[in-house]
Amino acid sequence: MAAKKNAKPKLVAEGRVNAGEELIATLKRRFAEHPHRHPGLDWQTVEARLDAGALAKLTQMEDTFGEPDVALIEGPSTVVFVDCARESPSGRRSLCYDREAWQARKEARPASNVLDVAGSMGIELLTENEYRDLQTLDEFDTKTSSWVVTPRAIREAGGALFCDRRYGHVFVYHNGAESYYAARGFRAKLRVPTA
């Protein structure tokens, strides 16, 4: 039987003892393949900071197809893993912005919302500036879009922000916070504690 095209990675699902080792190997390979995302950092420094809590969160990022990698979006001394999948993580799409927006939908509610999913995973939604910084490292979201942190005034007016890359430029847009689309997910970050 052929494997499903979008089958979920089985890092932890099968309960294998070496799931953490598999994840570390995946992260190490990705780190080595994209040195331009983290100039001046070496893998040993990063790996030394990966405790059980960070690995559990990174596993969830990987399992939802975020392809986390270290990206220098907060300066050279802060190790931050960011979703670096070319398109918005497919395991985190079709979500409205927050719980208030989810509750406001009377019909056709999505499974959940961005802020609750990110919170349950222990990761943080990217800000618009962090999203723009990430886009200087590679080209992301050329076919999809990603929700970003929305300023309070915009959210109180019922809106929410999302970004994408089209025509070689990064754009920020607004939408009703209760909207959700199959091609819109969210990118997040995980700060790794200092050793």
Please report, for each region that a protein language model flagged, where it lies by residue.
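A binding-site-centric feature that preferentially detects glycan-recognition modules on secreted/surface proteins
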Residues: 2-124, 128-195
